[in-house]
Amino acid sequence: MFQFGESRVAAPDRITDFEIGTDKIDLLNRRGGDIGAPDNFTRAPNNNAPTLRRLVNQVFRNADGGQPGQQELAPNSAVFVRATNPDIRGTYLVINDNVPGFQPQNDLVINITGYTGDLPGFGEIPLEDFFVI
């Protein structure tokens, strides 16, 4: 379970044993109430940003690597991104709350480096594959 406001860009949680296709993520609001799955889930293009904050800002501007051009991360949406810069290398799950734009004190940033299974390709990802519906 992840509660908005707890796994932030300044101090992201880390999951080292996430099993793609088996494990599911359950989301909670700031008061601890269940909010269900995001409305949309995509995989962003791989990103070479030098800091996690810059990576997340760029993902908010281009959240769908399966589409040409840039598609902003919509409110109540989630995205996978692979960071390729050695300083922050890894795979991250970024989840926007219900407020447009990046809210560093509330939006979730979770490091899932160490997952098992195949990371989905760029573009749309079925919600039920990763989230409690």
Model-derived features: positions:
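Low-complexity acidic/polar repeat-biased segments
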Residues: 52-133
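Acidic, glycine-rich calcium-binding repeat modules characteristic of RTX/beta-roll
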Residues: 1-51
